[in-house]
C-alpha cells in the first residue's frame, strides 16, 4: 500500500501523522511511504530522517493526495484537503465532529 503523509496545515498544529520510526516499520512491512517536503520540520524531524527510514519526499500535498492509497494526518482535514481526496482513498486521522456543526445546522430538525 502507498501511504501518504502531508504536512499539517491547520494553524498551530506542529505534529505530523508518522514519525521516521513509524515510517521505518511500515517500509519494513513492504509499504511505500510518501512524506511532504519538510512535513515533519515543526515536529522536530527533517527530510533526511524520513529518507533514511525509507520514505520518499514529495514536493506538495497535492502530489501525496494524487498518488497515495491512504492519507495519514493528525488533525481533521481542512477544506482544501477534503477537495483533494479521491474516491476509495482512505483517510486515517482524528475527526472533530463538533466542528462540522453550526448553530443553524443544530437547529435543523428536518
Predicted segment positions?
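N-terminal beta-loop-helix "entrance" segment that forms/cooperates
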Residues: 37-56
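Glycine-rich phosphate/diphosphate-binding loop of Rossmann-like nucleotide-binding domains
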Residues: 7, 12-36
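Redox-cofactor binding/interface segments in oxidoreductases and associated redox assembly factors
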Residues: 5, 72-73, 92-93
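Short acidic low-complexity segments
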Residues: 54-67
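Rossmann-like NAD(P)-binding element
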Residues: 64-77
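Single conserved hydrophobic/aromatic residue that forms the stacking wall/gate
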Residues: 101-110
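Rossmann-fold NAD(P) dinucleotide-binding segment
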Residues: 76-91
Amino acid at each position: 500500500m502507498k501511504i501518504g503523509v502531508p504536512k499539517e496545515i491547520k494553524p498551530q498544529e506542529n505534529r505530523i501523522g508518522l514519525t521516521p520510526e513509524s515510517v521505518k516499520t511500515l517500509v519494513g512491512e513492504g509499504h511505500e511511504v510518501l512524506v511532504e517536503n519538510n512535513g515533519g520540520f515543526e515536529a522536530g524531524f527533517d527530510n533526511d530522517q524520513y529518507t533514511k527510514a525509507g520514505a520518499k519526499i514529495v514536493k506538495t500535498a497535492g502530489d501525496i493526495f494524487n498518488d497515495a492509497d491512504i492519507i495519514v494526518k493528525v488533525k481533521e482535514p481542512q477544506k482544501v484537503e477534503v477537495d483533494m481526496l479521491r474516491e476509495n482513498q482512505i483517510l486515517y486521522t482524528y475527526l472533530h465532529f463538533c466542528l462540522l456543526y453550526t448553530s443553524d445546522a443544530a437547529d435543523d430538525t428536518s
